[in-house]
Amino acid sequence: MSLFFKSIKSKIEETLNHTPQVNLFNNSNNGGNNSNNGGNNSTPTLTKTPSTTNFPYNDYKNYTYKYVYDNTDNYNFNNNNNNNNNNNNNNNNNTKENNFKSIRESASIYKNNEEINNDDNNTIINKKKIEEEEDETNFDTSLIPKLGHEDKDELESDHYITIWGNGIRNYKNCNMSSIGFSEMYNQQKIVLISTGAIHSSFITDQGNLYTFGDGLLGKLGHGNLESYSSPKLVEFFQTKPSLRVVSIANGGKHSLALTICGKVYSWGGNDSCQLGLGNGSSSSYYSLPQLINFNISYNNNNNNNNNNSTNNNNNNNNDGAQQQFSLSQNSSSNNNKIKIVKLSCGTNRSAVITDKGLLFTFGRGDHGRLGLGEQSLLMQSTPKLVQSLQGHFIIDMSSGGGHSLVLTNKGLVFSFGRNDQGQLGIGCFSNQQTIPKQIQWFQTSQQQQQQPINIIKVSAGGYHSIAISDNNDTYAWGRSDYGVLGTSIDVQGDRNLPVLINSNSVVVDNVKFIDVSSGFQHNVAMSIDGSLYSWGCNAGQRLGFKSDENQLTPKKCFINSKDSKPLLFTCGEIITIIVEKRFKEPIIKTELQLPSSTQSQQQTELSLPSSVNSSSDSNFNKSIIDNSSTTTIIKQTNNNIKSTTTTIITRPSSPTPSFLSLANEGKDLLNSTQSNFIEWMTLISKSKGLLNLIQMKATSSLPNLGLSIEKKNKDFDDINRQLKLLVNSNLSLSPLPDNIQSEIDRLVLSRNQLGLGLVSEYQTSIDYWLEIKQQKDLTFLNLSKLLNLSTITTTTTSNTTTTTTATTTTTTTTTTNLINKKVLVHQDEKQQQREKSETELEEEQDEEEEDSEIKNGTLTAIEIQQQSFYLVERLNQGLGNFCNNIMDSTTMVQPLTTATASSTTATATATTTTANTTNSSGIINKNFGESLRLSMEEIQLIVLETQKYAIKYHSLLSQQLQQCDDLINIHRGKLVEVQDFLNKSKLAQSLLEQREKLKSDYRFCKRNSIELSKKIEVIELDYDQNLCDDDDNNHENNSVNNNSNNNNNNNNNNNNNNNNNNNNNNNIDNNINSNSINDSSNNNNNNNNIEKLKNELIKLKKDEQKLLSNQQEINELIIEILDKYVPEFKIKLRANDKISSRIKDTGLLVTDRKFQHYDIIKTLSTHPHNVYLANFNDQLVVLKEFGIGDAFGKQIFERQVSLLKQMNHKCIMPIQAVFYDRNAFMQMEYISGGNLLDWCRNNNNDNENNKRRQPWEIQKIFQQIIQAIAYMHSNCIIHRDLKLENVLIRQDGTPVISDFDLSKDISANVNVTVFNINGGTELYKAPEMKEQNVKGSYSTDIWAFGVMLYKCIFQFVNNNNNGNNGKNNNSDGNENDNNNNNNFLIIREPFLLPEENNLPLPANHSDQRLISLLSSIFQRNPKLRPTAHQIAVHPYFVTSLVEDLLSSRTLIDCREKIAAFRAHISSLSEMAEEMSESLQLTVRREHLVLDFFQFFFKKIESNKLFCRLEVSFQGEKGLDLGGLSSEMYSLLFSDNQIIDNSNNSNNSVSYSIPKNSLFSKKFNLFENSGTESPFYLLNSNDLFNNNNNNNEENNNNNNNNNNNNNNNNNNNNNNNNNNNNNNNNNEENPLLILKNEFTIFKILGKIFLKSIIDGKPIPDCFPTSFFKYLLGVKVNLRDLEIYDPQLAQSFKKVLVLDNIEEYLSTTFEGLIEGGESIPVTDLNKEEFIQRNIERVLVGCRQSKLEAFKSGFMSIDSLNAHFALFSPTELQLLMCGNTLVDSSVLQKNFKFIGFPDTSSTPKDFRRAVDEMNQDEIRLFLRFVTGMVALPLSGFEKSISIIQVPLSQKLPCAHTCSYQLDLPDYNDFDTTKKKLIKMLEYVDGFAFI
């Protein structure tokens, strides 16, 4: 009998774990994924999975079952995993074999599936090769990860996955925030986790890889592009034991995995080659893992002993010498192969770390993301070693948004990639860092620590970085938005250096962190006590807090408690995922006792963050039966009731006797009852499935916006009604009052915002209901399948009563048969009916009423769901009682054997015992049978009720699905309606623009038609006149007729020419007129022309009609749209119609511009118009407002816009845009240089504030002004208000005429004036305007121009009015200034007295051309005044005033000469710039001189030397704003050594000349006399015979000197010999490719001239003889002494010696013809010395000097200036200020970003003041690239920009004259850093 009850128990377990053959949630084989038109979400299913092994026959108390989440499609009661676990427990020795067997079985299924899939992206490439190369025995078990942050807990626990953040919405149907991973997957534990942008991966302790989340681009590795809401096993890695995954890394679009045998696989997006598959990979993504081929191995060149020694050394110090590796296809030993131990992924890049600490990267490489240098800035398709990190042992790496952090075993941190937000922590903000750079701050921190900071953990976020030190301090740097740096609100701004965050955030708790993970804009860290802290952006509650407010400092978000503790955590882009360990509830243990009543036990909730819903919030019922060794605990949790009931069923304390008959027949009963019992238990399991389906509620990650949509929709309609009413009621008002216009604007803005909000919410609502409908569809389908399968018991659903009766009969019969076959005592059913109590009858009545309610459809879905919870509780309790009854029977079988054995020993005793046993067992058997039958009937009643409710719920679901469809269609219709409404607004705007375009085209066409009609009429009249003339002159001779015809033709030509002048805009008319002119001599041709013109006129008429028709169509469409959708456009249309066509035709009108779009800075003027200085789109502009309330103001605005549009001249104020906003507005250029009056009063040179403008500056300005006036007059426009205040000056010195309020178009004959009838300012009015009320003419503008020039010359220019032409001015000019002021006092204002016809002018003025010009202008009779064109060609403007002053020697002062020269060059450069000419020069640093010479040789003519030179260095990025060209000149002219020869007469320092300098010996262009002289002259040797020729003349000269002074001669010979030897040993001259010595030195002269034109000084390293030769001045002994002091000293001794014949026996050989016969005597020794001086300094290099001079003097206009310079002045012009004045330099300093409290600017100035000349020159070169101060001053200021505090040296940007200076705030530190900076000038790169 014991066997029978054990069999019953086994069948119950087998039935409960039986899987019905039905797919509940999908009919397709797509991996469990469902999709429809409503979305891409998949629904998680309920799977009933045993959490222990197979049912233990010897101990039923260990059996439990649980409802858990699973993503499979079947309603599983599968126990295969439990069988495996049981087998593993029973046979530990075969564990590995069984696992491999299971893996191979699953692999065969997987491979079969792969054969069906034909998608190239979903197949395993090189599968055969992988199988052949895989080594299944070479497992590296050290790679297997351990449980993260796991401690030794004695209590059992489960792993749960908690998700924070809105990124979870991207996961399909993920409506839970916590996933019971261990319950879902057979008690597996998670050991490693990685999260990408919106997908995640987990590795378990069994080596399985699970992924879930967004599946786009196949980044989940499942062979498809589907997304999954819960972890799904990656089956690819189950195919082989060697594919066990030990490490995983997720990126933005892809994933990497490392297997136990060291192989790396990648899958997902491959748009940037981030999968590392090589260039042969053509696909943009792979949905299955692909093997990365590492064809790299270590070199083993040493023997084994050496290798062992090396290994030992490496073990002691892993950061030793760099590893040797080589590329190899086949390695002889596996020990040499690369072994990967660490993976890292970024957005589009990947990285791996080897066991030798090497780093390989691949993928996207821009901005240095891969750290491979500038050579790999694109994409790297295969792993490549980061060479610069060799020698460091890399142990960790973190990849952020665009940057990466690398950690070594010594705690050093390196960073590379993007650095625009300071995320690299290297102390600057730069665009990129292409190679890894160490963060030095940790080694030289400001934190006063005794030792450097060692880092143990790094994490890179989107634009920020986090690091943890070995003492658990946390540092952050990079972008500081959203509080992501955790430094509180007190520390603002991006940080380019690490900042300690613990002290600012958690100082009260004194929390230290041991681990950290960074997302795009948030961070999560684990403290030492195991709690989690988060900070940064909390959008979507990704930090675990309810509020969406950002967290500026670390705040505790997850507590390590006794119920749960966090183990692993990771931050994705916008989500946070935590793996937590939840401890199981302690087992309740009780002593053996009799059954007791049900006790209530309150369930303890897990400690979770307040913002995260616990797993108890799941939308399904969870039933758990826990079993101890002595007690069965049945739990039923109801989420709606939020309570837990626990029933404790305790075994009896002592055995109970069993029945003999039951034992005898148990064996036969086992076989006969098996089939019926399985059917009954299957029915129960299906009922449980039905109840679970009923309890499932459709949920969505999207909000239900029903109420919000309804409210917004109502508001939207109300606003439209209000807008229509407001517009229609005020449409007649013109203009609209401000309050009404403001209200209309407000309503329009509100309507548009509501419309956009409705579009978004309708779309969200549609997605919401589609998601709900999808879930309800699945539930409906699954209910249909289960109900169809249950027809074995129920026949139809139409007749509920009949079905119930039939089912009851069938089930009762089955139950009765079961009990009868068990030989149990049953009572008759009628007897049972009679024994029913009244209570039971009442219950039946209630059931009948309930059946009636179900049948009549009065129950709702919610009520049915509530009943299902009650039924589940009853069913669980019934099953528990049933199991209890069966299990108790096993205790009754035990005494049976004992009683039988004892009866054989004594018959009498046995008889008595048997009788007693029978009687006793009879009673017990009866009670047992009754209890068993009742429990079975109770279960069957529950099953029937379940079917009733399921049928009704199925019907309700059908109705709900129809309602969902209706609601979705309604919302879709509303969405289309709102979108159409918004689109109509855009359509109306487009139609208005088309309407205006058609109107403009119509006007143009109409004008052409009228003009063409007039032309046809004129031609016809001319033709008729010609015919009449022919008739009248029939009897005249042909010559007379011909003359008459010619005259007529001439008249025709004149008429046609006039028509041409009036119709320049019509190309067709011009062609017609041209044809008419050419053919007017022929009457036949005239007829043809008339026909052509008439045809053209007909075509124009047709075009007019077509344009009118199109206008009418658009007008009708506009009216329809405006009335229904956008009534506010009616006002806009009316206002647009009122705008003059003159404004519209300019193309300047901006219809959507408003005054509020401008940021008004200040008001510049209020009369006669409001003029504002405003900021628009980060640009300063001037906004001029015109009142257009009346026709007068409107006409003023339209005329001014029309006039300015006609003129396009650089000296006339341009209009940028016009718009209407109640008034009319004109946007113009903002000119910051002030007006002409201020310009004349102030001088640009701060050192000469007492001096006025120079005459040539005035001449240049007024020359441009008169050209602009001539341009205006040529367009028939007069200004009528010219004055100094109305002429503005740009920064480049260009004058701009403005304020055209009084301007007039004479051709239009418009007599509109403003404010006074004549207009203009009184002082500038012409006499006729004052006396005759003339309203203005061309001559009035000429008079005003003369007044401006008169005031500038006589009031603001330092002229010699007293006729003192030849007098030298003092340097300070005070005497002349006083004389000029006295002369100015007697000069009156420029107006005419009544008796005067012209203005008296000073007769003794130095510039008579100026007096002549002014005399011609200041004439009373307007007709006598010159025109603007005549003034422009007046001698005063034609002849350069600079040249005139030079020729008259008026410019005596050196600075005046140089200033005049610079002014002349400036004017010529501006002319070249106007022609848009520039010189583009790209040079190589290593071949700078050669590139420069070739550039001049091929492209540079003398007339192009004034063009702007734009320099770029090959392979370097940079924009030449002056700095790059300065650097190029500095490198060209002995860049590495600045030589100061200003006070140098005897310098004995030897200088090292760089190879790329003009002075390098390899070019052989210059030479010096020896080490005592630093000066250079052109080389006297032949460039092409340098290696073979020695200078015999020098040797002779040395021999001559020998006779005079042996010691000196010996020294000279030695020096000369050394020089010759050096010359002979020089490498080949690169310049010899030019093949012409004269060309080389001519180009050299042009280079020097170009440097002067560009204002780039050269070093002062040339003697005075060089400049004297250029100017034609004779050299002397002093010049030789500068160049060759030793030789000059010898000559001096010769001069002082008497009787020279006695000491020096030499002749004039080589100096003059026949000199060998002329001895040197006291009489001719001076001539001898002078000739030697000329030979040494000039003669031996005469040809080179001539070639140089031909290039240097190649521009004739500059030679006149050079002729006026002295050699010293020319030297000053070329070399600049050799003595750098620090005070002059400091006037150009501009400090930016330093706070007022900082002392660094003051300390910096002081440090510069204390520099010596050498240091200050180095400073000048470091910042600007120049070696001397230009005499013309700096082109722009030197910007000194504050950067965050650090110990780094200042950094210079020569392109922009910028110096990045840390805010040291200490003088000693500032000075020390500056001096240190100058020591390493050559080590700094010029940016």
Curated annotation (Swiss-Prot):
Coiled coil: none annotated. ATP binds at L1164, S1165, T1166, H1167, P1168, H1169, N1170, V1171, Y1172, K1184. It comes from Dictyostelium discoideum. Residues 1501-1887 form the HECT domain. This is Bifunctional serine/threonine-protein kinase/NEDD4-like E3 ubiquitin-protein ligase. It is an enzyme of class 2 (transferase). PANTHER family: UBIQUITIN-PROTEIN LIGASE E3A (PTHR45622:SF60), UBIQUITIN-PROTEIN LIGASE E3A-RELATED (PTHR45622). GO terms for biological process: protein ubiquitination. InterPro entries: HECT_dom, Hect_E3_ubiquitin_ligase, Kinase-like_dom_sf, Prot_kinase_dom, RCC1/BLIP-II, Reg_chr_condens, Ser/Thr_kinase_AS, Ub-ligase/GTPase-reg. Residues 840-852 have a biased composition (Acidic residues).
